[in-house]
Amino acid sequence: PRLKRGFIEIRPEDVKGLEKFASTIKGALKLGRRISTVFVDLAVVGSVAVDLRGNRLGKGGGYGDIEIDLIMRENPRVIIATNIHPIQIVEKVPVSEHDKKVDLIITPDRAIWTEWGRIRHQIG
């Protein structure tokens, strides 16, 4: 929700012994440093449900879609993953034009490349 002010970088060496506090919004704001851009190779986003085509349902508000869009602007080849329980994989997720897809679904037992992810990353 604080995307208007940019991303916050939290480096492990800067929060030794304060990891739990640093994982909160208040802690991140106090211990982290603001950065204007972010370049990552793998982004893990939350989902309420996903389908095997790569469509995801977030919590509403579009914040996950905004985060994915900002990350992909810096690295178009970033892998967008979501970690979920297998019961959250559904037949079809309703989508709208602004919704962003995930490349990879991670469950406790396996990793599944979505149709979108296989096409985008040219995986057989």
Predicted regions and their residues:
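An anion-binding catalytic pocket shared by soluble metabolic enzymes
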Residues: 1-9
